[in-house]
Amino acid sequence: ELEHPFTLVFTLANLSRIYTSFHNVNRALEFADEAIAVSTQYSFALGLALATASQGWALAEQGHEAGLGKLIHGISATRVTGANLNIPFTLALLAEIYLRNKRIDEGLGTIEEAQKLAGTGGELFWHAELLRLKGELLLAQSDLSVQAAEQCFSEALKIAQAQHATMLELRAATS
């Protein structure tokens, strides 16, 4: 057992985020719930915010309507702490939920915000995933957007290959 609650919270929150990137809902939720419990016990606002976002994503993936609200709350709470790291990734999760719920305009707006934040913050690791999701949203928006969507997928694939990001490359290639 780890006797340092601050380290424990961030380990749990980061494990939850890792499992969200693999779309492993059950493990993401398990670690998020643990991080929330410890964060609440010790009043760790950032750990609570990060874990709440992951928990919200997992619940939304399971079809719980409250999940979307928790995800949005987690993003807002993270921003309140002044932390900006991983916000583009979390916004990508939000855009994915919007896509699944056919809320295309909100999804596209979320992707646009994530791309701006990633560019200004130098957080470009998820750039390929943001482009892939933009392509998926464009495809869902209209048949007139097919060419723009294909361009997003192509660019996402090139970026993922250049970054040697195999997981993101596979996602882009299968979109």
Regions of interest found by a model, annotated:
Residues 1-175:
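Helix-coil-helix junctions within alpha-helical repeat/solenoid scaffolds
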